Every structure is written in C-alpha cells, then in structure tokens.
Curated annotation (Swiss-Prot):
Protein name: Uridylate kinase
Activity regulation text: Allosterically activated by GTP. Inhibited by UTP.
Organism for this UniProt entry: Wolinella succinogenes (strain ATCC 29543 / DSM 1740 / CCUG 13145 / JCM 31913 / LMG 7466 / NCTC 11488 / FDC 602W)
Reaction(s) catalysed (UniProt annotation): UMP + ATP = UDP + ADP
GO cellular component: cytosol
Protein family: Belongs to the UMP kinase family.
Top EC class for this record: transferase
Enzyme Commission code(s) on record: 2.7.4.22
GO biological process: 'de novo' CTP biosynthetic process; UDP biosynthetic process
Renumbered residue ranges of the record's region Involved in allosteric activation by GTP: 19-24
Length: 241
C-alpha cells in the first residue's frame, strides 16, 4: 500500500504551532512535527506541507469590524503562513532534512516563488517542500490552498493533521456520545456540513478524486502508520462506495 502513497501533502493549522500558548510559535511543537516528518522522509515518502496562519492572524477575524478590508486582511494572513513556513523550515533543517519554502507571493529575499514543476523536482530529490502564502489570492482558505497544491504536485492524499483522531458526527470535545466516522464520501462531508474542510476544498478534492485523511498529529508515529495503510487511526473522505 505504501508504494501507492509515496507522495503526500500534510496540512497543519497555524493554531497547532502555538501549543498551549494560543499565540505565536512553540518550538517544542515544531521539533515534534519535524521528527514526525523526518520519519516519513526516511521511509522514502515525498512530503509537501501547508501551514495555516491562525496563530498569528486570521484574515476573517481581522476584517470583522470593518477597519481592515477583507482583501487586505487575507493578504496579512498569507504573510503569516510564510512566517510559519520559515519557522518550520528551520525546525526541519535542524532535524537534518533538506527543505525548500515556496511562496505564492514573491518574497525572493526569503524563499522561492511557487513553480509547480520546481516543487515536483524538489520532492523527487527527497526534499521537503513547504508551500506558503495560501493560493496567493484573498478569499481562499489554507485548506483550499493545501488541496490545490496536493493536486498540482500529484499527491496521493492530503492529510489534515489535527488535535482529534478523525471526523466525528459532532464535536467530541463537547459531546461524550460523539461517534467517529471512519469513512465518509465527499458528498456526505459537503451535505452534512461536517467540519472537515471548507466546501471549496472538499469540492476541489472531489473533482480530482483526492482522498482527504484526518488524523491526530500529536500521537507519535501516526502519520507514518496512516500512510502505510493503518486507516483505524484516522477518518478518510473519498469517493462514495
């Protein structure tokens, strides 16, 4: 099964990087993520990464009171994702990995501009590629950006690394009777408004038959086990059976 899943894109939320602080970047979490990604690379898995920017600023929230226009707020959010991407690059390099950051917005003093052919070449050479600045356009989430990049680089799946071990029929943090959904179709994820990703991201994955895997990022070894085929540790959104 692993041979069919040799290239993946992992999506981390910006909030996850903040840890218990709720804001900024917790270097201990960066170090943990780096060790998890390193285990993938050591197992010949090509890895792309997208990180949100919510630990620094969220475009939607910044534009709520009307002082900052939504377009500008979203660009601010894109810059936040680049900050996180550079931090992750440092952590991965500290772990001994070869890493490139590619931004959808030109920031030539800091990182490469996104070129999908170059990204694929980096992956083929065993480098981890971190995609920053979302899609480069306002009004699109980093979930949508992650799905887009996964499709462009030919990833076999997109893994949404979260604080829970999959998708539930309701919030497991609030409801003790919440049931984990091991598998669900794209249509179910869209129609039931289950909080997997935003509708644009799910629809894009559906149109391109890209499996969405939701798992707990804080359990050591989870990412590798899931890529190697242990679906009991996650929820998988895919085509209707």
């Amino acid at each position: 099964m692993q041979s069919k899943r040799s290239r993946v894109l992992v999506k981390f939320s910006g909030e996850a990087l903040a840890g218990e602080n709720g804001f900024g970047i917790d270097t201990k979490i960066l170090g943990f993520i780096a060790s998890e990604i390193r285990s993938l690379v050591e197992n010949k898995i090509e890895v792309g990464i997208v990180i949100g920017g919510g630990n620094i600023i969220r475009g939607v929230s910044a534009a709520q009171d009307g002082v900052i226009r939504r377009t500008s707020a979203d660009y601010m959010g894109m810059l936040a994702t680049v900050i996180n991407a550079v931090a992750m690059q440092e952590a991965l390099e500290h772990a001994g990995l070869d890493v490139r950051v590619q931004s959808a917005i030109e920031l030539k003093e800091i990182c490469e501009s996104y070129i999908y052919r170059r990204a694929i070449r980096h992956l083929e050479k065993g480098r981890v590629v971190i995609f920053g600045a979302g899609t480069g356009n306002p009004f699109f989430t980093t979930d949508t950006a992650a799905t887009l990049r996964a499709i462009e680089i030919g990833a076999n799946m997109i893994i949404k690394a979260t604080k829970v071990d999959g998708v539930y029929d309701k919030d497991p943090n609030k409801f003790s009777d919440a049931k984990k959904l091991d598998t669900l179709s794209y249509e179910e994820a869209l129609d039931d408004r289950i909080k997997v990703m935003d509708d644009t991201a799910i629809a894009l994955a559906k149109d391109n038959r890209l499996p969405i895997v939701v798992c707990n990022m804080f359990k050591p070894g989870n990412l590798l086990k899931i890529i190697q085929g242990d679906n009991g540790l996650c929820s998988v959104v895919g085509q209707r059976q």
